[in-house]
């Protein structure tokens, strides 16, 4: 199932994308998938940022080839950093580079969308908190 966020006229909403149609959902899919009865042709809506995150936690230098490419070596512990939630954009929207950025890498990244609050989760249970996945950079 492909869950997206879409804009139609002045409304923004979650939806299910099926072929060339968008099936509108009520509320957020984190609380359960509920169709509201409205459907739109894909060409009539604009796909927007796939989620409305409260925070974005990133892992840097998480594979050897990229760490070597940066000539800084791979850290012993994961390098965590945050990105502002405003950096998420929709399909075919412009990515704005911050003026202060001296180096911006572009790479294909896998985003894991956490669907509910979690703390000190055992590795064997982590999958229970994953809502879905998305493409990021």
Question: Which residues are covered by each model-predicted region?
Answer:
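Active-site microenvironments in enzyme catalytic cores
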Residues: 1-13, 17-137
